[in-house]
């Protein structure tokens, strides 16, 4: 078996495991039912897009309504099977993300395959990944943005030289190779298709979620690092689209940004309410913005703070420090980050520092861009794309370390090194297993919402006179039982945390 085949088999196993757990989560009540009911009343996909343009004064996300309308039409065509369509779409996108991760990593050797196994544990074990695949509103736009980022980077990895030159074929009559006429145009068309696809990914991502603007940083950082799959003309087009986005948002739709106190966020060891934020930072918002940007940038490499809140420090002060959870999360993150920093500080075959290579440089750009976009409030999901590229850097670091250890480790040191590697991998595997627990808990919570947030316990999210889908959605959610994870023994919540 070739190493690349083993890598793709491993990728498929991860994709199936994550997708199966994602599919079990019912369509949630909060942030979903109202959108579904409103979009279902629109006559067409174009009308849904138009509705999305004017749905909010702060959020420009018309592609959410557009995709939702397309999925609703598909569900109606299948006999109103909403759970099948929406959860199937969610599960499929989770599998696509993991597949794109391996496609971008490009494992070729057995060292690469081993490093990929570790990197997939890092990817699925990060707290940013949990939020990215668990929530859906009613589609998971954070997951879609991460997919668009990987797609643009994969397009940047393409080799344009093969598109611009017509291939040569040996001509016996001339005694030398001759260019094959008519082939150059088709190769040039392929290059144009890549540019168009990159621009389309950015346009769709930016209209899906505000953090979709980070897709532009992927394209520019990849080009700055030496990748030429996306041409300079396409970068100019992406820059023009960015300007157009700002003009549409500010000049055309008169939208405003998120102000202090619109959403709760963490500060220090506390989670502040919207009222607390207005009182504490209403006159000096720059303090909150600076803290939120910094804490968002730290949450990927350190797994702390969570949504701006230093939960480990707060738990230690309160005497509720969950040793296994916090120590495992923080220590494994420190080890992975140390490997990434070591790798980026080394020099490649060309003599330059590896932080300037495509994946590390893009990872730094996405981390900075995502943190800047989360200035108003910290949220782990906003940093999910940065978490994906962080795991890619860890892949490169582990692959390089494996090659060096295989070539230079003496017989007496191989066993201790193997034990250390096994311990670190097992710790990350423990974190990755926690993803399955959190997804199972998310499925139970989403199902419970259909009881606790509906009459007689709560007013319905949509008035009964306007509800055309709610009863069917509730029946589908309650039809299949979900295990109550809070009754499991031992208390898995203390092993994998509540974040």
Locations of the language-model features?
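Hydrophobic/aromatic-rich transmembrane helices and adjacent perimembrane loops
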Residues: 140-142, 369-370, 377-400
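Transmembrane-helix signature of polytopic, membrane-embedded enzymes
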Residues: 101-129, 145-146, 361, 365
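Transmembrane-helix motifs of polytopic, lipid-linked glycan transferases
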Residues: 88-112, 150-154, 337-346
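Membrane-lumen/periplasm interface segments of multi-pass, membrane-embedded glycan/lipid transferases
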Residues: 30-80, 250-337, 384
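Perimembrane helix-loop-helix junctions
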Residues: 214-247, 251-256, 266-270
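Membrane-interface alpha helices of multi-pass inner-membrane proteins
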Residues: 192-209, 216
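Transmembrane alpha-helix segments characteristic
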Residues: 119-120, 337-374
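Membrane-embedded, lumen/periplasm-facing catalytic core of multi-pass transferases
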Residues: 412-499
């Amino acid at each position: 078996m070739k190493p690349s085949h083993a890598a793709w088999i491993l990728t498929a196993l991860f994709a199936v495991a994550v997708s199966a757990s994602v599919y079990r989560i019912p369509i949630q009540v909060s942030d979903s039912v109202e959108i579904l009911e409103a979009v279902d009343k629109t006559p067409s996909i174009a009308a849904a897009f138009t509705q999305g343009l004017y749905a909010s004064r702060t959020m420009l996300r018309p592609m959410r309504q557009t995709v939702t309308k397309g999925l609703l039409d598909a569900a109606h065509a299948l006999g109103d099977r909403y759970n099948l369509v929406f959860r199937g779409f969610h599960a499929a996108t989770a599998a696509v993300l993991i597949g794109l991760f391996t496609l971008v990593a490009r494992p070729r050797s057995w060292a690469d395959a081993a490093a990929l196994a570790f990197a997939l544990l890092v990817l699925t074990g990060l707290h940013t990944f949990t939020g990215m695949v668990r929530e859906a509103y009613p589609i998971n736009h954070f997951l879609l943005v991460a997919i668009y980022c990987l797609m643009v980077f994969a397009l940047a990895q393409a080799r344009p030289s093969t598109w611009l030159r017509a291939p040569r074929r040996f001509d016996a009559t001339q005694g030398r190779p001759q260019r094959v006429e008519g082939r150059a145009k088709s190769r040039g068309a392929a290059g144009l298709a890549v540019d168009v696809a990159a621009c389309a990914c950015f346009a769709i991502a930016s209209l899906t979620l505000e953090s979709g603007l980070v897709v532009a940083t992927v394209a520019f950082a990849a080009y700055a690092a030496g990748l030429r799959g996306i041409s300079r003309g396409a970068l100019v087009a992406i820059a023009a689209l960015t300007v157009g986005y700002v003009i549409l948002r500010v000049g055309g739709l008169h939208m405003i940004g998120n102000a202090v106190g619109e959403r709760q966020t963490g500060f220090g060891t506390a989670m502040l309410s919207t009222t607390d934020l207005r009182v504490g930072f209403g006159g000096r918002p720059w303090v909150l913005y600076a803290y939120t940007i910094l804490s968002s940038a730290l949450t990927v490499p350190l797994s702390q703070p969570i949504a701006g809140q230093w939960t480990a420090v707060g738990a230690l002060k309160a005497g509720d420090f969950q040793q296994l959870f916090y120590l495992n999360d923080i220590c494994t993150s420190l080890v992975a980050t140390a490997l990434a920093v070591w790798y980026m500080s080394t020099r490649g075959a060309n003599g330059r520092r590896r932080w300037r290579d495509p994946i590390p440089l893009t990872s730094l750009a996405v981390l900075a861009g995502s943190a800047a976009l989360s200035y108003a409030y910290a949220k782990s999901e906003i940093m999910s794309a940065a978490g994906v590229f962080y795991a890619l850097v860890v892949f490169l670091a582990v692959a390089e370390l494996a090659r060096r250890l295989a070539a230079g480790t003496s017989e007496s040191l191989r066993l201790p090194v193997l034990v250390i590697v096994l311990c670190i991998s097992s710790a990350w595997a423990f974190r990755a297993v926690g993803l399955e627990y959190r997804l199972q808990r998310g499925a139970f919570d989403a199902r419970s919402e259909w009881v606790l947030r509906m009459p007689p316990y709560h007013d319905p999210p949509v008035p009964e006179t306007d509800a055309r889908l709610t009863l069917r959605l509730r029946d589908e959610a309650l039809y299949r039982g979900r295990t109550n994870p809070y009754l499991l023994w031992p208390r898995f919540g203390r092993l994998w945390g509540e974040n």
